[in-house]
Design a protein with these regions (language model features):
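Metal-dependent de-N-acetylase/amidase catalytic core
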Residues: 1-4, 82-251
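Active-site rim/loop-helix segments in enzyme catalytic domains that contact anionic ligands
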Residues: 1-97, 127, 238-244
Length: 251
Protein backbone atom coordinates (compact mmCIF):
# COMPACT_ATOMS: atom_id res chain seq x y z
CA UNK A 1 0.00 0.00 0.00
CA UNK A 2 1.05 3.58 -0.61
CA UNK A 3 1.00 5.87 2.44
CA UNK A 4 1.14 9.67 2.24
CA UNK A 5 1.78 11.79 5.32
CA UNK A 6 1.08 15.40 4.36
CA UNK A 7 1.44 17.88 7.22
CA UNK A 8 2.45 21.52 7.43
CA UNK A 9 6.11 21.69 8.49
CA UNK A 10 9.27 19.61 8.79
CA UNK A 11 9.12 17.71 12.14
CA UNK A 12 5.28 17.55 12.22
CA UNK A 13 5.16 14.04 10.73
CA UNK A 14 7.77 12.80 13.18
CA UNK A 15 6.15 14.47 16.18
CA UNK A 16 2.58 13.35 15.56
CA UNK A 17 2.92 10.15 13.51
CA UNK A 18 6.55 9.04 13.44
CA UNK A 19 5.90 5.77 15.26
CA UNK A 20 2.98 4.84 13.04
CA UNK A 21 5.00 5.60 9.91
CA UNK A 22 7.84 3.45 11.23
CA UNK A 23 5.43 0.55 11.81
CA UNK A 24 3.91 0.91 8.34
CA UNK A 25 7.32 1.08 6.66
CA UNK A 26 8.51 -1.99 8.59
CA UNK A 27 5.57 -3.92 7.16
CA UNK A 28 6.72 -3.08 3.65
CA UNK A 29 4.35 -0.26 2.80
CA UNK A 30 5.61 2.62 0.65
CA UNK A 31 5.71 5.76 2.82
CA UNK A 32 6.06 9.30 1.49
CA UNK A 33 6.35 12.29 3.82
CA UNK A 34 5.44 15.66 2.33
CA UNK A 35 5.53 18.99 4.10
CA UNK A 36 3.57 21.96 2.88
CA UNK A 37 6.42 24.34 3.72
CA UNK A 38 10.18 23.99 4.25
CA UNK A 39 9.84 25.63 7.67
CA UNK A 40 11.21 28.96 6.51
CA UNK A 41 10.12 30.87 9.63
CA UNK A 42 11.57 28.33 12.05
CA UNK A 43 14.60 30.29 13.23
CA UNK A 44 15.54 33.47 15.06
CA UNK A 45 19.08 33.33 13.66
CA UNK A 46 18.96 32.18 10.00
CA UNK A 47 17.35 33.89 7.02
CA UNK A 48 14.22 32.25 5.54
CA UNK A 49 16.22 30.73 2.67
CA UNK A 50 18.97 29.49 4.99
CA UNK A 51 16.68 27.75 7.47
CA UNK A 52 14.51 26.36 4.66
CA UNK A 53 17.56 24.69 3.09
CA UNK A 54 18.63 23.28 6.45
CA UNK A 55 15.18 21.94 7.24
CA UNK A 56 14.66 20.28 3.86
CA UNK A 57 17.84 18.29 4.48
CA UNK A 58 16.77 17.45 8.04
CA UNK A 59 13.37 16.26 6.84
CA UNK A 60 14.95 14.04 4.19
CA UNK A 61 17.31 12.52 6.77
CA UNK A 62 14.43 11.88 9.15
CA UNK A 63 12.38 10.17 6.45
CA UNK A 64 15.34 8.01 5.43
CA UNK A 65 15.52 6.54 8.94
CA UNK A 66 12.38 4.52 8.17
CA UNK A 67 13.02 4.20 4.45
CA UNK A 68 10.48 6.86 3.50
CA UNK A 69 10.67 9.41 0.70
CA UNK A 70 10.41 13.14 1.37
CA UNK A 71 9.62 16.25 -0.63
CA UNK A 72 8.26 19.73 0.06
CA UNK A 73 5.23 21.31 -1.61
CA UNK A 74 6.96 24.71 -1.28
CA UNK A 75 4.27 26.78 0.35
CA UNK A 76 5.61 29.22 2.96
CA UNK A 77 5.14 29.39 6.71
CA UNK A 78 2.10 31.35 7.88
CA UNK A 79 1.00 31.71 4.25
CA UNK A 80 -1.07 28.58 3.64
CA UNK A 81 -4.54 29.71 2.65
CA UNK A 82 -7.63 27.82 1.53
CA UNK A 83 -7.95 29.17 -1.98
CA UNK A 84 -8.29 27.75 -5.46
CA UNK A 85 -4.59 27.75 -6.25
CA UNK A 86 -3.61 26.06 -3.00
CA UNK A 87 -6.27 23.39 -3.39
CA UNK A 88 -5.01 22.54 -6.88
CA UNK A 89 -1.39 22.40 -5.69
CA UNK A 90 -2.28 19.98 -2.91
CA UNK A 91 -4.33 17.91 -5.34
CA UNK A 92 -1.20 17.71 -7.50
CA UNK A 93 0.69 16.23 -4.53
CA UNK A 94 -1.90 13.47 -4.21
CA UNK A 95 -1.84 12.73 -7.92
CA UNK A 96 1.96 12.58 -7.85
CA UNK A 97 2.04 10.13 -4.93
CA UNK A 98 -1.18 8.15 -5.65
CA UNK A 99 -1.75 7.13 -2.00
CA UNK A 100 -4.14 4.51 -0.69
CA UNK A 101 -4.07 6.11 2.76
CA UNK A 102 -3.45 9.74 3.72
CA UNK A 103 -2.56 11.11 7.15
CA UNK A 104 -2.75 14.85 7.70
CA UNK A 105 -3.02 17.48 10.42
CA UNK A 106 -5.87 17.85 12.85
CA UNK A 107 -8.52 20.32 11.60
CA UNK A 108 -8.38 21.96 15.04
CA UNK A 109 -4.88 22.80 16.27
CA UNK A 110 -2.77 25.61 17.68
CA UNK A 111 -1.24 26.66 14.35
CA UNK A 112 -3.06 28.21 11.40
CA UNK A 113 -0.83 26.27 8.98
CA UNK A 114 -1.91 22.98 10.56
CA UNK A 115 -5.59 23.83 10.29
CA UNK A 116 -5.38 25.10 6.71
CA UNK A 117 -3.34 22.06 5.67
CA UNK A 118 -5.92 19.72 7.17
CA UNK A 119 -8.79 21.24 5.23
CA UNK A 120 -6.83 21.49 1.98
CA UNK A 121 -5.81 17.84 2.19
CA UNK A 122 -9.39 16.80 2.91
CA UNK A 123 -10.56 18.68 -0.18
CA UNK A 124 -7.71 17.35 -2.32
CA UNK A 125 -8.57 13.76 -1.42
CA UNK A 126 -12.01 14.41 -2.90
CA UNK A 127 -10.70 16.30 -5.94
CA UNK A 128 -7.76 14.09 -6.90
CA UNK A 129 -9.87 11.38 -8.63
CA UNK A 130 -12.03 13.91 -10.52
CA UNK A 131 -10.76 13.93 -14.14
CA UNK A 132 -12.20 17.36 -14.93
CA UNK A 133 -10.38 18.99 -12.00
CA UNK A 134 -7.13 20.45 -13.31
CA UNK A 135 -4.01 20.44 -11.17
CA UNK A 136 -0.40 21.31 -12.00
CA UNK A 137 2.15 18.61 -12.68
CA UNK A 138 0.41 16.56 -15.31
CA UNK A 139 -0.02 13.42 -13.21
CA UNK A 140 -3.15 11.35 -13.86
CA UNK A 141 -6.20 11.49 -11.59
CA UNK A 142 -6.31 8.99 -8.77
CA UNK A 143 -8.50 5.94 -9.22
CA UNK A 144 -10.49 6.57 -6.02
CA UNK A 145 -10.74 8.80 -2.97
CA UNK A 146 -8.09 7.59 -0.50
CA UNK A 147 -8.67 6.71 3.14
CA UNK A 148 -8.11 9.86 5.21
CA UNK A 149 -6.93 10.06 8.82
CA UNK A 150 -6.33 13.14 10.97
CA UNK A 151 -3.40 13.04 13.40
CA UNK A 152 -3.77 14.42 16.91
CA UNK A 153 -3.43 18.15 17.59
CA UNK A 154 -0.50 19.42 19.64
CA UNK A 155 -0.66 18.17 23.24
CA UNK A 156 -3.76 16.16 22.32
CA UNK A 157 -6.10 19.01 23.22
CA UNK A 158 -8.50 21.39 21.51
CA UNK A 159 -8.29 25.18 21.69
CA UNK A 160 -9.92 25.16 25.14
CA UNK A 161 -7.36 22.64 26.47
CA UNK A 162 -9.97 19.88 26.57
CA UNK A 163 -8.79 16.38 25.60
CA UNK A 164 -9.17 15.69 21.87
CA UNK A 165 -10.11 12.03 22.16
CA UNK A 166 -8.98 10.08 19.08
CA UNK A 167 -10.96 7.35 17.34
CA UNK A 168 -8.03 4.98 17.70
CA UNK A 169 -4.58 4.81 19.25
CA UNK A 170 -1.59 3.09 17.67
CA UNK A 171 0.77 1.32 20.08
CA UNK A 172 4.19 2.75 19.25
CA UNK A 173 6.20 1.47 22.24
CA UNK A 174 8.16 -0.93 20.02
CA UNK A 175 9.32 1.87 17.70
CA UNK A 176 9.94 4.73 20.11
CA UNK A 177 13.65 4.52 19.27
CA UNK A 178 12.80 5.19 15.62
CA UNK A 179 10.49 8.06 16.53
CA UNK A 180 13.19 9.62 18.72
CA UNK A 181 15.77 9.26 15.96
CA UNK A 182 13.46 10.80 13.37
CA UNK A 183 12.66 13.79 15.55
CA UNK A 184 16.31 14.18 16.58
CA UNK A 185 17.20 14.64 12.91
CA UNK A 186 15.52 18.07 13.14
CA UNK A 187 18.45 19.49 15.07
CA UNK A 188 17.80 23.08 13.97
CA UNK A 189 14.53 23.08 15.88
CA UNK A 190 16.01 22.56 19.33
CA UNK A 191 16.93 26.23 19.69
CA UNK A 192 13.84 27.50 17.83
CA UNK A 193 11.44 25.56 20.02
CA UNK A 194 13.25 26.65 23.16
CA UNK A 195 13.28 30.32 22.18
CA UNK A 196 9.87 30.58 20.52
CA UNK A 197 7.76 27.86 22.18
CA UNK A 198 9.43 27.71 25.59
CA UNK A 199 10.08 24.00 25.01
CA UNK A 200 13.30 23.06 26.80
CA UNK A 201 13.72 19.60 25.26
CA UNK A 202 11.58 18.66 22.29
CA UNK A 203 12.41 14.95 22.54
CA UNK A 204 11.21 14.82 26.15
CA UNK A 205 8.11 16.81 25.18
CA UNK A 206 7.36 14.31 22.40
CA UNK A 207 7.70 11.45 24.88
CA UNK A 208 5.34 13.19 27.30
CA UNK A 209 2.74 13.75 24.55
CA UNK A 210 3.06 10.15 23.35
CA UNK A 211 2.62 8.86 26.89
CA UNK A 212 -0.43 11.10 27.35
CA UNK A 213 -2.06 9.70 24.20
CA UNK A 214 -1.13 6.17 25.23
CA UNK A 215 -3.08 6.54 28.47
CA UNK A 216 -6.33 6.70 26.49
CA UNK A 217 -5.73 3.03 25.62
CA UNK A 218 -3.66 1.86 28.63
CA UNK A 219 -0.47 1.91 26.53
CA UNK A 220 2.98 3.18 27.44
CA UNK A 221 3.20 5.28 24.27
CA UNK A 222 0.64 5.95 21.57
CA UNK A 223 -0.29 8.09 18.58
CA UNK A 224 -3.92 9.05 18.11
CA UNK A 225 -5.89 9.36 14.88
CA UNK A 226 -9.38 10.20 13.73
CA UNK A 227 -10.72 8.45 10.65
CA UNK A 228 -12.59 10.89 8.37
CA UNK A 229 -15.72 8.99 7.39
CA UNK A 230 -17.98 11.60 5.82
CA UNK A 231 -19.65 10.71 2.51
CA UNK A 232 -18.08 9.70 0.10
CA UNK A 233 -14.75 9.02 1.83
CA UNK A 234 -13.82 5.35 2.48
CA UNK A 235 -15.02 4.03 5.84
CA UNK A 236 -13.32 0.63 6.01
CA UNK A 237 -10.67 0.51 8.80
CA UNK A 238 -7.64 0.45 6.52
CA UNK A 239 -5.09 1.61 9.10
CA UNK A 240 -6.14 -1.19 11.44
CA UNK A 241 -5.96 -3.69 8.59
CA UNK A 242 -2.44 -2.59 7.65
CA UNK A 243 -1.02 -2.58 11.17
CA UNK A 244 -2.97 -5.49 12.65
CA UNK A 245 -5.28 -5.67 15.64
CA UNK A 246 -2.40 -6.02 18.11
CA UNK A 247 -1.09 -2.53 17.28
CA UNK A 248 -4.43 -0.69 17.45
CA UNK A 249 -6.74 0.28 20.28
CA UNK A 250 -10.10 1.61 19.07
CA UNK A 251 -11.79 3.94 21.56
Amino acid sequence: MRILHLHAHPDDAELFSGGTLALLAAKGHHVTIVTMTPGDCGSHHHSPDEIAAIRRLEAARAAAIVGAEYFCAEFRDLAIFEDDGARRRVTAVLRRTQPDLVITASPIDYHCDHEATSRLVRDACFAAPAPNYDAPGGDPPMKAIPHLYFADPAEGTDRDSRPAVPHLVVDIASVMDKKRAMLSAHESQRLWLKEHHGMDNFIETMEEWSAKVGKFASLAFGEGFRHYRMHPYPVSPLLEELLGAAAIRRL
